[in-house]
Amino acid sequence: MDVTVSKVDTKLLDLLVCPLTKGSLSYDREKNELVSEKARLAYPIRDGIPIMLISEARRIED
């Protein structure tokens, strides 16, 4: 499934924050994830819905 960020999704991205750090997120189009650089976590997007649960996040390795 190819998911692209639309105008509405961009507004949503501006509102969403990392649930752990409350910091901003960036969108990784290649992996279809929202990334928190501060927490070193990547939150998956499934069927166009960001899964903002720490337990579902992937830890980003160096």
Swiss-Prot record:
GO cellular component terms, A-Z: cytosol
SUPFAM superfamilies, per the entry: Trm112p-like
InterPro entries: Trm112-like
A Pfam family: Trm112p
Protein name: UPF0434 protein Arad_4458
Family: Belongs to the UPF0434 family.
